[in-house]
């Protein structure tokens, strides 16, 4: 039995799906920038922070070995990255605001390791959890359990 989602749950789930897509796009964009730089012999440590710092440094220097076209493309990709960050932050803020007003989210966030995003995603997916007889049922539903529930 799967409970019908409330309109609020559906809205929250949509926010999570959109945020997840934006995060995937940002990761792909960062990897694309990394690839462009690597093709030109410029290596950057893994992670968004080193890449952002390297991109700012590269674009702030006078033209060097990078062609004007690549500099322009890198600048445009940097702008795309900023727009994605802005949208991700806006949706994350909205999710956080909704989670602060939800008692189920607040309860879940008392569990060590569960933050706003995880708690609100769980509430969006399963509501208050009353549809499960025991914790194992939830684990089986979320595919986090290695043994099937009989």
List the model feature ranges, each with a label.
Residues 1-2:
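A polyampholytic, Gly/Pro-enriched intrinsically disordered region
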Residues 107-150:
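Phosphate-backbone recognition surface of nucleic-acid-processing proteins
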């Amino acid at each position: 039995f799967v409970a019908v989602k409330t309109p609020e749950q559906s809205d929250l789930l949509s926010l999570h799906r959109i945020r997840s897509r934006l995060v995937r796009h940002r990761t792909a964009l960062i990897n694309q920038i990394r690839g462009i730089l690597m093709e030109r012999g410029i290596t950057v440590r893994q992670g968004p922070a080193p890449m952002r710092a390297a991109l700012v440094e590269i674009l702030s220097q006078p033209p060097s070995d990078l062609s004007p076209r690549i500099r322009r493309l890198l600048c445009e990709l940097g702008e795309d990255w900023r727009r994605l960050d802005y949208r991700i932050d806006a949706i994350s803020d909205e999710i956080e605001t909704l989670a602060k007003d939800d008692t189920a989210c607040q309860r879940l966030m008392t569990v060590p390791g569960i933050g706003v995003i995880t708690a609100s995603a769980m509430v969006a997916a399963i509501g208050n959890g009353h549809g499960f007889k025991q914790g194992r049922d939830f684990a089986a539903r979320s595919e986090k359990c290695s043994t099937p529930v009989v």
